[in-house]
Regions:
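Structured aminoacyl-transfer and RNA-binding surfaces used for tRNA recognition/handling
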Residues: 1-104
Length: 105
């Protein structure tokens, strides 16, 4: 079984909804929720500022701490909710239908 006390997560820096769900619904303490920049927690990386144009969204990643203290990514979620069109500002257009793309590691 996976020990929940060994889990930590990352969210995109502005994704208050994901952080709240991890904390309030799943029970991950805020001390184990890291908010990262778009180069780390947005798909494709740095899409808001650098592109490419197309479907994109913030990410959340789940990590497990091994006995050695090392952490490994065990799962990721991409909240596909925008279409990037052109350069900032105002270049992220909400998609009419949003989805969550998930994957292991």
């Amino acid at each position: 079984a996976i020990d929940p006390a060994r889990l930590s997560v990352t969210v995109y820096k502005d994704d208050d909804e994901a952080a709240k769900i991890w904390n309030e619904k799943i029970g991950i303490p805020t001390s184990r929720i890291s908010r990262l920049e778009e180069d780390e927690n947005f798909w494709p990386a740095s899409a808001p500022s650098q592109g490419p144009d197309g479907v994109c969204g913030p990410c959340s990643e789940i990590y497990y701490q091994l006995d050695s203290g090392k952490t490994v990514e065990i799962w990721n979620l991409v909240f596909t909710q925008f279409n990037r069109v052109g350069d900032p500002p105002d270049n992220l257009r909400p998609l009419p239908s949003k989805n969550i793309d998930t994957g292991m590691g």
